[in-house]
Amino acid sequence: MNMLQRRLEDPEVLVRLNAFFLSYFGWVAFGVLYGVIGRWSVDLTPQFLRLPLTSRDLVVGLVEFTKGVPPLHALFTVVYYLGFAGSIALIVAYLLLYLRDLEASDRLLARYLMAYAVAGSIYLIAHIYAPHIVYNLPGYTSDNTLLTRQEFVLPSLHNTFIMINIITLWKYRKRLGGKVLILTNSLIPFATVFLGHHWIYDVLTGFLLGIAVSRTSWEWGARISAGIYRWEVSSLQRVTVLNFLLAVIVLIVAADPARALAIFGGLLGGP
């Protein structure tokens, strides 16, 4: 607890935490705006389905196999629902709050920003839909949320970040925390395919994008304005708390939009 308290009183750590929050909120905002700016994106799903390893039999077979092994299904479900945001939160907490590796966190942020930019540009040009959408698998939602859009499939940004995470964590592979995080991240690609959320090609292109971004930015680090460091620690702490609460609200709304809006409406005294 004393270490966590010290980290949360460290302006270097607080500034970087808020930078990660803001980059994530930027991606959420892009997803919301995509409903408007993505109208000209070309749907290449029919052409994509001509490729091998995209058949209904394969997709349904993998999903049914996974469901037929309850421990495996439970493991993959937990790993998958750790989610995009969860995988980011864990590695940021490990690098910043536990290790205070400022250099690694700066490189991680730079890689995330590049991945957001490249993947977002691709989705604006063309997109495909996920296996569970294409084959209308029962038990899956086709609704867009604050965290996901059904067009954001190839390359899989989730798997891009997984590769970035593993590459960034690799120097800590002999530490227990590093081993656990690398193992957890390594399971996520399998979960996305075996649960029908992604095609095999999504994972592979996501990996390639993650490797390309990491190699391109190998010596880069995100630069943060020096003026922010002149803020008082108490001000940085308040901004951090605000961003944390906003992130929690985003997750709650994304999990069950209708229920979340009903709750917020009740709290605000709405009808």
Language model features with spans:
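Alpha-helical transmembrane segments of multipass membrane proteins
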Residues: 26, 30-34, 38, 118-123, ...
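N-terminal transmembrane-helix/juxtamembrane module of multi-pass inner/ER membrane proteins
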Residues: 1-87, 265-271
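Helix-loop-helix junctions and helix-breaking kinks within/between transmembrane helices
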Residues: 189-206
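Membrane-interface loops
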Residues: 45-49, 97-188, 224-271
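Hydrophobic core of alpha-helical transmembrane segments in multi-pass integral membrane proteins
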Residues: 26-36, 89-93, 242-256
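Hydrophobic transmembrane alpha-helices
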Residues: 166-171, 210-221
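Hydrophobic alpha-helical transmembrane segments
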Residues: 21, 25, 78-96, 109, 158-161, 178-183, ...
